[in-house]
């Protein structure tokens, strides 16, 4: 694969102003500032454990709440992943990982199929982690899936601490994405589909 697998997305609305840069073949370097500290912490997990170089800057109406910024970061990051993958030639396509964090264990399975779908099964008992509304975890992944064109299954195997569960989820997600987006040298420039194409629906 000769071309660089990286992309930049800028997205501005009346509610948020977001820029995202990603290098899929990076080393886990990140500069992230969304104005939402817990989301920043989770995005650093994606970069660190996925070995993606990631730069995210977001300015949003967090004086109202975090919903718009959280969702729009998911949108922009999903678009950045999709753009960096291009035609998805040579990728492994499928990824899965179990990540533990103390008592929590979360499984993530995904397919860079071009077919957006989310199955989400986290039981988060705490309404907030710090100041972060735990309902926003699902909203982030919905936004990401719809704009990256992946099929994503998130399953909580066990766990009681909401912070541990969410962090295990993001770590498993990052490793599964790393697995799915890595180049399979046996595929060369071929698209990993019997249809001969993978496109976001």
Curated annotation (Swiss-Prot):
The record's subcellular locations are: Cytoplasm
Q: Which Gene3D superfamilies match?
A: Imidazole glycerol phosphate dehydratase, domain 1
Q: Fetch the Pfam families from UniProt.
A: IGPD
Q: Which domain of life is it from?
A: Bacteria
GO annotation, biological process: L-histidine biosynthetic process
Q: What is its EC number?
A: 4.2.1.19
Q: Which InterPro entries match?
A: IGPD_sf (IPR038494), ImidazoleglycerolP_deHydtase (IPR000807), ImidazoleglycerP_deHydtase_CS (IPR020565), Ribosomal_Su5_D2-typ_SF (IPR020568)
Pathway per the UniProt entry: Amino-acid biosynthesis; L-histidine biosynthesis; L-histidine from 5-phospho-alpha-D-ribose 1-diphosphate: step 6/9
Known catalysed reaction(s)?
Answer: D-erythro-1-(imidazol-4-yl)glycerol 3-phosphate = 3-(imidazol-4-yl)-2-oxopropyl phosphate + H2O
List the transmembrane segments. Answer: none
Q: Does the keyword Lyase apply?
A: yes
Alphabetical keyword list: Amino-acid biosynthesis, Cytoplasm, Histidine biosynthesis, Lyase
Task: Name the chain's protein.
Answer: Imidazoleglycerol-phosphate dehydratase
Q: Which organism is it from?
A: Prochlorococcus marinus (strain AS9601)
């Amino acid at each position: 694969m000769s071309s660089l697998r990286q992309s930049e997305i800028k997205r501005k609305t009346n509610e948020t102003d977001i820029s995202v840069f990603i290098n899929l073949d990076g080393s886990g370097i990140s500069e992230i500032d969304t104005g939402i500290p817990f989301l920043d912490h989770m995005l650093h997990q994606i970069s660190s454990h996925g070995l993606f170089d990631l730069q995210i800057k977001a300015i949003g109406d967090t004086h109202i709440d975090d919903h718009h910024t959280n969702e729009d970061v998911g949108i922009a990051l999903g678009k950045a992943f999709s753009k960096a993958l291009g035609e998805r030639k040579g990728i492994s396509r499928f990824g899965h990982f179990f990540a533990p964090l103390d008592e929590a264990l979360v499984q993530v399975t995904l397919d860079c199929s071009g077919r957006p779908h989310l199955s989400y099964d986290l039981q988060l008992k705490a309404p907030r982690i710090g100041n972060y509304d735990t309902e926003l975890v699902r909203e982030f992944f919905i936004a990401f899936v719809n704009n990256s064109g992946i099929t994503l299954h998130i399953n909580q195997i066990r766990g009681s601490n909401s912070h541990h569960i969410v962090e295990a989820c993001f770590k498993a997600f990052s490793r599964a994405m790393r697995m799915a987006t890595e180049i399979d040298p046996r595929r060369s420039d071929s698209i990993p589909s019997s249809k001969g194409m993978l496109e976001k629906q």
